[in-house]
Amino acid sequence: MKKILAIAPHTDDIELGCGATLHKFKDLYQIDTIGITSAQPLATGDPIQEFYEAMSIIRANVTFLGYTPRILNEQRQKLLDYFWNLNKKNKYDIIFCPSSYDHHQDHQIVYQEVFRAFKHSTILGYELPWNNRTFRTDVFISVDEDDLDAKIKMLDCYQT
């Protein structure tokens, strides 16, 4: 079976950026996901648990790394080493990560290290409109109402 890796600098980024697309592919690919950081759990919920619940909707394997948000630049080499070793073990066909046009500092670091480690895979960047000053796309993937409903269910897992 072919493999997809979806990477979230923060626990809700996958759902927002490519949740419907991953739902579309859930029966065709093994989907692995990585949550790199999370905000501290708030009184209304636990973002790490919410991430696991959301990813269960697309039957994804989940890894949470537990890095601190907004200082990923201090962990660049660790991230690169982690991604490099993961790529050697798994040889993913498609990688979803933040777009190269994303201006959030954590998203930029993740994109850059993903690009270095997985340069022989297809890398598709997802966009979060509030982080991008421009909209530039090379790939559109059609999703249906069922995929969109699944994305909404994934987002509904979050109380935080």
PLM features per residue range, with description:
Residues 2, 57-60, 90, 94, ...:
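The feature marks non-catalytic terminal segments
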Residues 83-132:
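Active-site adenylate/phosphate-handling loop in enzymes that bind or generate adenylated species
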Residues 1-91, 115-120, 146:
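Active-site rim/loop-helix segments in enzyme catalytic domains that contact anionic ligands
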Residues 39, 70-71, 98-102, 139:
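Conserved short-loop catalytic and cofactor-binding motifs
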